[in-house]
Amino acid sequence: MKKYKKKIIITGALGQDGLILSKLFIENKFKVFGFVKKIKKYKLKNVKYLKTSLTNFSTLSKKIKYINPDIFIHLGTDNPNFLETKKKYSLKKNYKIIKNIIDFFSINKVKTKIILIGSSQMYKKNGLKINVNTNFKPQNSYAKFRIKSHKYMMKCKKRFNLNATTAILFNHDSIFRNKKFLIPRIAKFIKQKKFNELKKIFFENISGDFSHAEDICKGIYKLALSKKNPNKLIFSSNKRTFINDIINYLLNLSSIKIKFAKMKRKKYLSSIGNNSLARKELNWKLKKNILIAAKELIKINI
């Protein structure tokens, strides 16, 4: 019989970050339980997947009590960008789930390490570097939900002495990234030689903070193991990347001799995440970058 160091629950365990984190914990002898909406064909061998309704407090509570996890990472949030027709319902549902999770650990006084996820969209687009002391200024209703969730966590953290942190994540990609996002779309357009679609993206001259998802997940992993209990930490690349540089890199990598007209690099409003506190507190280092993620995406069948 295998001996495990600790037990961890990961919601949304079949998403990009859930898969990467599950692998990390399995490699380090953790017993991993994945709470999912439905069991997919692609899953990891050593993860115990449980179809779970996170909106049902009673059902959720019973499963958490039974497992008695040392760590709980909540990744299972609907992205309203893909559910525009159901945005209000989606955000209300997302908040109910967060509240259920926090309420369980508050009521039962369980000293589990809790990690919630935040977004760069919680901050104003000002072209500057965002740090943990920057005031929230939501860009959209999704960001408002994230801020509301963080504030509720903080309220309960102070009252019930929870070990809880909001990990604020900036853009990060890998081969597991949802194909509707920008970098996977670019890789797909290049592989399918859809240069008109590529040109449209090129002329938007987008820039922002982009990382390899494995780096971001390694930071979350280190946070999960840390004895420290910060209120929030930023996980980002700490630098600005221009999407046009990624496009040109992938075109060159694919031996496609096509050039779009050079454009002036405008002063874009997208902000950059200052990850210095996370690096210091967790001894976290970035070992990869977004170009490596893009290269990996172009090599797989999308």
Please place each PLM-identified region on the residue numbering.
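C-terminal "lid/loop" region of Rossmann-like NAD(P)-dependent oxidoreductases
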Residues: 199-205, 231-233, 241-248, 255-270, ...
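Conserved Rossmann-fold NAD(P)-dependent oxidoreductase catalytic core, especially the SDR/UDP-sugar
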Residues: 72-74, 99-140
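NAD(P)H-binding glycine-rich loop region in Rossmannoid oxidoreductase-like domains
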Residues: 54-93
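Rossmann-fold cofactor-recognition segment
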Residues: 45-56
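NAD(P)-dependent short-chain dehydrogenase/reductase
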Residues: 128, 151-209, 213-217, 221, ...
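Amphipathic terminal alpha-helices
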Residues: 2, 290-302
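Short-chain dehydrogenase/reductase
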Residues: 91, 139-147, 180-184, 209-210, ...
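N-terminal Rossmann NAD(P)H-binding glycine-rich loop of SDR-like oxidoreductase domains
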Residues: 8-27
